[in-house]
């Protein structure tokens, strides 16, 4: 007999344009499921998800993919860089999906590498970088195409405190420039950098 597991139960909240929101809660409470739905990697079985004015929960798969590639940037705990590509190539990757001319792609990559203080690593491969440098590359890749929304899943989880603080500073600066950020974290100190915190427990919001 199949037993239905409810990962998220009547979760309702609004993130305003330009806000920085942290999501906290114990392992297994639904944080990753929520982030996957926000990132259009999973579909909710019921309910709606409005991204701007569009109910993206009703889109066809191809349209969802286009929205994801054009409007949402992802930052992961494990960086998720492609080992065979250089730093510059990793950062350029999202731009190749947007029919952007090569010259403009290169210029954008140069600008964001300078911003993230990794220009001197442009031709290095991920395994030649420290954890902090890899996360800077991952953030550069996430923002290079100017997404409306950044989803960060434990962005400092694999970093020491110094590199973690630098990554949080970068995210805070991006938010101050107008980027909307939703961040899942176990770290209370990181959560304090957000404007508000949503706490999940057993698939429900217990505090907002």
Feature annotation, model-predicted:
Residues 1-197:
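ABC family nucleotide-binding domain
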């Amino acid at each position: 007999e199949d037993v239905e597991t409810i990962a998220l139960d009547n979760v309702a909240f609004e993130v305003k344009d330009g806000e920085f929101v942290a999501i906290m809660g114990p392992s297994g409470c639904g944080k990753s499921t929520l982030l996957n739905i926000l990132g259009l990697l999973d579909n909710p079985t019921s309910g709606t998800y409005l991204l701007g004015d569009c109910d993206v929960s009703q889109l066809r798969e191809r349209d969802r993919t286009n929205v994801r590639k054009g409007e949402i940037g992802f930052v992961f705990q494990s960086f998720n860089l492609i080992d065979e590509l250089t730093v510059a190539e990793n950062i350029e990757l999202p731009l190749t999906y947007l029919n952007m001319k090569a010259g403009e792609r290169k210029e954008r990559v140069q600008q964001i590498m300078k911003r993230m203080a990794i220009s001197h690593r442009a031709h290095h491969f991920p395994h030649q970088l420290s954890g902090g440098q890899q996360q800077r590359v991952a953030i550069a890749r996430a923002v290079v195409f100017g997404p409306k929304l950044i989803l960060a899943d434990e962005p400092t989880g694999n970093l020491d405190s110094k590199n973690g603080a630098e990554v949080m500073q970068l995210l805070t600066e991006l938010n101050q420039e107008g980027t909307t950020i939703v961040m899942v974290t176990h770290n209370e100190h990181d959560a304090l950098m957000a404007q508000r915190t949503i706490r999940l427990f057993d698939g429900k919001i217990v505090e907002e």
